[in-house]
Amino acid sequence: RRQRQMCIRDRFHAIYDIEESLYSDWMLNLLLQPLVENAIIHGVDQRPEGGGTVRITATQKKDTIVFTVEDNGVGIDPQILPNLLTQDSDGYGIKNVHERVQLYYGKEYGLQLESKQNVGTRVTLTIPACPKECHN
């Protein structure tokens, strides 16, 4: 397991905690980027006191890979949270990621959202484990 920390221009800290055995696994492109961007733009950048932390983890659990993107930002409005995976929004949002995952990997995979206002948000992405040799 490798853990790295970095400070991005004094705006926030990023912590990566990735199981090294997953470095060679294959996954669809652009699944994590929108999740991390949302954590920064709509989470930690909105903190009145500034700063904040975004933590990205990846672990293998049996035959799945579980990614989490967590922030200690402002959280998501509880009125909006239940609809984020089903309603259209601007950009390449989490609905797009969720639909792409389910279309490619199956309905048992996708995103789960947890959030508390003024505490932060956790987005969990679950996909099947796929070493490079399984994708040809």
Model-derived segments and spans:
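A short glycine-centered beta->alpha linker in the GHKL/HATPase_c
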Residues: 75-77
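Short, small-residue-biased leader/transition segments that mark boundaries at the very start
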Residues: 1-8
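Short beta-strand/loop element within the Bergerat-fold HATPase_c
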Residues: 51-63
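Conserved ATP-binding N-box helix of the HATPase_c
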Residues: 29-48
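Acidic ATP/Mg2+-coordinating residue in the GHKL
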Residues: 71
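Conserved catalytic submotifs in the C-terminal HATPase_c
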Residues: 13-23, 116
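A short beta-strand-to-loop micro-motif at the C-terminal edge of the catalytic HATPase_c
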Residues: 47-49, 112-120
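ATP phosphate-binding glycine-rich loop and adjacent ATP-lid/helix-beta elements
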Residues: 5, 28, 38, 82-110
